[in-house]
Amino acid sequence: MRSQSGSGVSDRGAAARAPVERARAEAFRAVGELEAAIGLALAALPDESRFRPWLTRIRADLVDLGSDLALPFEGERRPPLRIEARQVQWLEATCEQARREVVPLRAFMLPGWSEAAACLRAAHGVCRRAERRVAGLARLEPAGSHRAAYLRRLGDLLFVFARAVDADTGARPRLRRPSAATLARAAERIAPEPAPPRQAPA
């Protein structure tokens, strides 16, 4: 049945699109928050920081991602900005380069002991939330494969950047050491079950 609004869209069709549009709005909002979080990290970095060009490029990529999310995938002759494979590949290469400059992880490390690193650590958390929102949208409508991949790689990179910024500022990394209760629970899970008692032969 057609609606009386003159838009030519059925009430049933509009209702079917509502969950998709809610998911799109949540994903778009999360990416906007991520861009703002990276802006805070940039503001905390000194002007001569080697991370500024990288983070500035990432902010520009997030504008592309916002455009990508704002418009559904349809057969348009002039498609809007979309996240492309080359942008994901750049993140991967940059992450590998940054990893070579920090001490290899041998335990769970808590970065963020300088102001800029703390901002990057917060941006990492926002990025993971944006990744979940984008994945939720992808379950409801066909989407390009590069949206979630970009955010997944960006989350990895922001964590490594936070560690590298701590190293540059001389902040000592802190290792997360499990509590005694956590170790006891882990030991219970891996302890072998006792063998059943043997019955005497009849």
Feature locations, PLM:
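Phosphate/pyrophosphate-binding loop motifs in nucleotide- or prenyl diphosphate-using proteins
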Residues: M1-A202
